[in-house]
Design a protein with these regions (language model features):
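P-loop NTP-binding core
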Residues: 1-147
């Protein structure tokens, strides 16, 4: 069975012993990856009923983080339990956002969620920046968003 982030987090929830480094893919560029798949979205449902559900990812990362200078967690664009786990485990956040109107509204919701996580779960969480993506400098909306 391929080791994925979903498998790792499920094992933490079940309090099973595991080699936290098994399944981590190492590359020549000195970048390691923990693969993921659609099972991660299924994990959302399991996290709802898990004990200490906001800290499952933090508990896993605490086993491996000393080996790395940085750990990047690329979340899906939702505010579900996996994203909340990532926010609870993170030191800081970089928010990618498209230079358009509707994604800006989503960012407002995300900022509100980050504030709640900071208040209740992870007091040290900071926002390191906002990364604009898909910027078309020819449009007025993109120009005003960049400003």
């Amino acid at each position: 069975m391929q080791q994925t982030l979903s498998n790792k987090l499920s094992a933490v929830m079940r309090e099973e012993q595991q080699d936290p480094f098994s399944g981590i893919l190492s590359h020549e560029e000195k970048v390691d990856l923990v693969p993921s798949n659609l099972d991660l979205s299924t994990l959302e449902m399991s996290l709802v009923t898990a004990m200490s559900r906001e800290s499952v990812m933090k508990n896993y990362l605490s086993q491996v983080k000393d080996r790395y200078d940085y750990v990047l967690i690329d979340c899906m664009p939702s505010l579900g339990m996996v994203t909340l786990n990532a926010l609870a485990a993170a030191d800081s956040v970089i928010i990618p956002v498209q230079a358009q109107y509707l994604p800006g509204k989503g960012m407002t919701q995300l900022l509100s969620t980050i504030a709640k996580v900071k208040k209740h779960t992870n007091r040290n969480l900071t926002i390191d920046g906002i990364l604009l993506t898909l910027v078309d400098g020819r449009t007025n909306l993109a120009k005003s968003t960049v400003r």
